[in-house]
Each structure stands twice: as structure tokens, then as C-alpha cells.
Amino acid sequence: MEIPAIQTEREDITSEKMAQINPLPVPLGPWKITVYDQENFQGKRMEFTSSCANIMECGFDNIRSLKVECGAWIGYEHTSFCGQQFVLERGEYPRWDAWSGSNAYHIERLMSFRPICSANHEESKLVIFEKENFIGRQRELCDDYPSLQAMGWGNNEVGSMKVQCGAWVCYQYPGYRGYQYILESDHHGGEYKHWREWGSHAQTFQIQSIRRIQQ
């Protein structure tokens, strides 16, 4: 649906401006996201094909709605890719609760984002370990699991993980609820030895559901 011109201010991102905004070297790929400073795709909008470490440098005080047109992305609560993580797959997100999903935490901020370069839904493989540093009982995952306990994991914690292919999103609670942790095969060499490596917001080993990220 076309946004009325009186309500929309569109700005194209030049390569020079993106070089200032984006501190991460990201290879060219099929990624495109459009962000808006008002809910329901209203207000100022801006298109990106690469990462943005601080949306305030683009004249936004926050992102209140967005559309993912190509690829998969990670949104972050704070600037510089910090705080809670939100997986953003292809589709429309008219309000903050559309990307936070059934997260039990009320977080309306989304201040930085980047593409998930390794997402490959058809060829994804993850190995989870009972204890940190890849010790103890292990299990190889190649599918989506709304409940690790139901598939026989036996407890509500995961000590460490190795992403062998693709990208995954892990959730604190069953049914894809709670904090989100995005794990990628091209970050940390695909190895996450301790919960502290899952993200700056991670505080616990608790993971009870896991799924592949859709490209």
C-alpha cells in the first residue's frame, strides 16, 4: 500500500553514507529492509541493504515499524548491535510487538540492525552440548524444535553450541518465547562456548526451544 506523500519522507542511502553508518564489513547479498519512525509504516522511512549501527545517525529517534523485503536480519534493542536481539525474517512488522513476538519482556526500542549472512533454512545444522566448552551430552539438530525437553533433551539448559551450517534462533522458553539468541555459522567460527557469547543480553544457560532462521 502506497504511503501518502504528505506523511512520508523517504531518503535513499548512498554508499558513502552507509560507510559512515556501518562499521561492519558485509558482503553484497540479497538483503533489503525498510524502516519507519512511526507505527503501521507511517512517517519517515529509509531503505537499507546493509547494516546500521545507530539509527539515530539517520535522523530517527527509534524504529516503530519495518518491512523485510529480502534476506533475514537481526534487530537490536540498543545501538552498536547491543541489547536484546530480534530475528527479522521476510514480512511486515507494523509494531514493536510483531518482532518481539511472544517475548515476555516489553521492549519497544529497535536502534540497530544487520543482515544474517549465513541463514540457510534448507541446510542448517546445530550441535548442542550439556555443559560449557562443548563438554557432556550432545545432540545434533537439523529441524525446528518448539520444545527441547519434548524431543528428549531432558533439562531446560544448554551449556554450549556449535553452528555447523546456517543460522539459528534459540529461545528462553518452549514455544519460541522469551529472550531470543541468534547463532550464526560465520560468527565466533560457529562456536559458542558459553552463554555469555550468545549476546550482550544473555544472563542464563536457559534455552528451551530452537528453530532455523528463514532466508
Swiss-Prot record:
Signal peptide: none annotated. SUPFAM superfamilies: gamma-Crystallin-like. This is Beta-crystallin A3-2. Pfam families: Crystall. Residues 1-30 are annotated as: N-terminal arm. Crystallins are the dominant structural components of the vertebrate eye lens. Residues 31-70, 71-117, 124-165, 166-214 form the Beta/gamma crystallin 'Greek key' domain. The keyword Repeat applies. GO terms for biological process: lens development in camera-type eye; visual perception. Has a two-domain beta-structure, folded into four very similar Greek key motifs. It comes from the Eukaryota.
